[in-house]
């Protein structure tokens, strides 16, 4: 709205937005004559990641710690622009954008490049940014970040440690992991 009222545009690039959650699915959508749903997932094992996942995601922290990304406004600020962009490419105008946030507490000790995560601490997080159209989630960006491939075993995972996945329900339906 600010750009529109000021007669300006906003250009962002990088991984997110910039390829994995927007250009990758939209490129695959170009193969479809109809797109009903799109899910773009980032499924990563952070065991060897040296960045700040404690403050941002709460990994390694106590379960009651509220990390930065647990705030819905922050998730929408960081990833929200991608959701309506994909919706536009699918030919729909979203009614709303929602988010989810889940954490998984490890029952065992987990060793990372940054140290040890003790039992009873968060060792995986899953969050989504969802484009809602006529009461249904039609566009979804999903992130699952874990310490060890066996963490949060009921959550989505890829065939290798780090996966970018696109799942399009349409004509034809497309499933791609990179």
Question: How does the language model describe each region?
Answer:
Residues 25, 96-99, 170-172:
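Low-complexity, compositionally biased segments
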Residues 7-13, 69-71, 178:
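A short glycine/serine-rich beta->alpha loop
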Residues 2-4, 58-63, 170-171:
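Short amphipathic alpha-helical segments, especially helix-boundary/capping motifs
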Residues 158-178:
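A hydrophobic, small-residue-rich beta->alpha segment in the mid-to-C-terminal subdomain
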Residues 1-46:
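A contiguous active-site-proximal alpha/beta segment in oxidoreductase catalytic domains
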């Amino acid at each position: 709205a600010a750009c529109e009222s000021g007669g300006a545009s906003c250009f962002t690039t990088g991984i997110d937005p910039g390829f994995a959650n927007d250009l990758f699915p939209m490129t695959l959508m170009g193969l479809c004559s109809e797109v009903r749903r799109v899910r773009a997932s980032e499924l990563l094992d952070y065991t060897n990641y040296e960045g700040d996942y404690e403050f941002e995601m709460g990994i390694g922290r106590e379960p009651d710690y509220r990390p930065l990304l647990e705030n819905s406004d922050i998730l929408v600020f960081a990833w929200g622009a991608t959701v309506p962009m994909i919706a536009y490419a699918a030919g729909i105008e979203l009614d709303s954008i929602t988010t989810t946030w889940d954490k998984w507490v490890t029952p065992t000790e987990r060793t990372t490049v940054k140290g040890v995560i003790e039992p009873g601490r968060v060792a995986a997080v899953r969050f989504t940014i969802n484009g809602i159209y006529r009461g249904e989630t039609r566009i979804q960006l999903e992130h699952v970040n874990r310490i060890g491939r066996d963490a949060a075993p009921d959550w989505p995972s890829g065939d290798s440690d780090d996966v970018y996945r696109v799942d399009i329900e349409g004509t034809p339906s497309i499933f791609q992991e990179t």
